[in-house]
Amino acid sequence: MPQTLLPEPWMVINGNTAMEDLFGVPSRSRFLSAPGLLSKEECPLNLSGNELRSEFAESISCTEQTYGANTVSVGVDTELDLLEFGRSDFRMATSPDAVGYETDEATLHRRQKQIDYGKNTVGYQCYLQQVPKTERKSGVHPRTPNKSKKYSRRSWDMQIKLWRRDLHAWDPPSQNSFQEDHSFKQTQRLLESWLQESNSLQNPDMDWLGLQLSSLQNLGYSEDQIQNSFDWLQFRGHTNDYTYPHWIGL
């Protein structure tokens, strides 16, 4: 009897669906399957030609007893290739850049200085004393930013700003009241000095007139003479824009 002929592997594997039907694994690549997946399966001994063709979709390799040939293997990869591929995957998965860690030394040093500055405040010390680590809740209590994660400069600075602002809520009450009173007194003094300066700038003529009248009283002038002098000064103030003959003496 003539020997049953089977189709060549490249005649059967013509698409992704055929790959999945043949190997039972996603058709990522024939060379990435487990070693020996296609070469260690054996075909049954007593099968007709049609049954052999149906079984070919489930098992590509057949033993020498059935077909009189050596084991047929399609796309068999070596263990060395798989090992090298596994190592490259492991390096990519564990690299600092892949998981988003900051590796720049200058950036890490700058971030640590910002964290140390925040931890040296009175509010942070009170926070450590009043809230133990086991009682802290995310979203409620301040949390120190993670300097090792990769952030943009703007994102990191915003995290530090919000963290320090939350720490100020734990400042002692006496310190808060002292700062508020001190700032209020400074503002009040500044306002009073500004009002005094504005009043002195608005009434320079009145101050000069009061000085002149007090000197006239000391010289013994009567009230009528003082009033006349005052009227004359007012008249002169209203007529400063006009010119007079030289013989008036003004």
Swiss-Prot record:
Domain of life: Eukaryota
UniProt keyword annotations, A-Z: Cytoplasm, RNA-binding, Translation regulation
Motif range (Nuclear localization signal NLS2): 77-80
Classification via InterPro entries: SLBP1/SLBP2, SLBP_RNA_bind, SLBP_RNA_bind_sf
Gene3D superfamilies named among the record's database cross-references: Histone RNA hairpin-binding protein RNA-binding domain
GO biological process terms, semicolon-separated: mRNA 3'-end processing by stem-loop binding and cleavage; mRNA transport; regulation of translation
Molecular function GO labels: histone pre-mRNA stem-loop binding; mRNA binding
Task of the protein: Binds the stem-loop structure of replication-dependent histone mRNAs. Is associated with translationally inactive histone mRNA stored in oocytes. Could be a specific translational repressor. Not involved in histone pre-mRNA processing.
Protein name, UniProt field: Oocyte-specific histone RNA stem-loop-binding protein 2
